[in-house]
Amino acid sequence: MCDAGRLNYKWINSEFRLTQIKGPKTEWSLALRDIAETLRKAPLGSVAMVASARQTNEELYLLKKLATKLNALTDSVPRTGEGDKLLVNADKNPNSNGAKLIGIAPAQMGSNLPKIAEGIHSGSIKTLIVFGEDVTKCGISADLLGKLSTLIVSDILPNKTTEAAHYVLPGCAHAEKRGSFVNTKGRVQRFMQNTQPKGNARAEWEFLHELVYDVTGQNGFVSIEGLFNQMAKEVPAFQGVTWAALGDLGVTINL
């Protein structure tokens, strides 16, 4: 484990963690039903989505299904730093490859962000869905967020985007859920839950499954194993891989 991964953990137990739903409805079932109704009524192409490349493959897969139904413009936020070309990679997102393979992020991650900002400015984008990012740091200002009819955000800690949101859905840290990532070498690796979510927070894949069903009518698996296996059947890069096959070492796929 790198030093950043070993030492950067205290935020998980931060006193500022988002632990309750913010919005007109504050119970999960009612909030998701309300959001689903809003999305069903949204004209095609009037919704955009920014989903972090720190989300799991399973979460990104469900978000992609939602985006396809809504004809939503999507992207992820590139996150780069210093690399040593040996052990430390310059890409600081743990799942950039997953976001690209699943289709949330374009090949040039971040290239759709200016288009989303312009769409909000022009009024063609009226609803924005954000998972795990503070978009005010990547060209979508708080003023632009104020122009939206609906801003739906899921995150772990408060930021300027959660402050502007009409709905905030509290998500989980990696240690509080299960899922998988695709690393820089193309190895699909799974991780396991070792602590309970804070307050009323839920694993994103769990409530996304409910939301996708409410919006699209497409039911799916309610276990992480079944969800991964369903994704592997639909996303070409993952075909032939199963959750069980990942084991402790993972499985390498073609990038």
Residue ranges: model-predicted function:
Residues M1-K41, G45-A51:
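Catalytic P-loop NTP-binding/switch module of NTPases
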Residues Y9, T56-N57:
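Short, acidic Gly/Pro/Ser/Thr-rich loop/turn segments
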Residues F16, T26, L30-L32, K41-A42, ...:
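Non-catalytic alpha/beta scaffold blocks inside enzyme catalytic domains
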Residues A48-T56, E133-T136:
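Conserved short loop/turn motifs at secondary-structure junctions
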Residues V241-L255:
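Acidic, Ser/Thr-rich low-complexity intrinsically disordered segments
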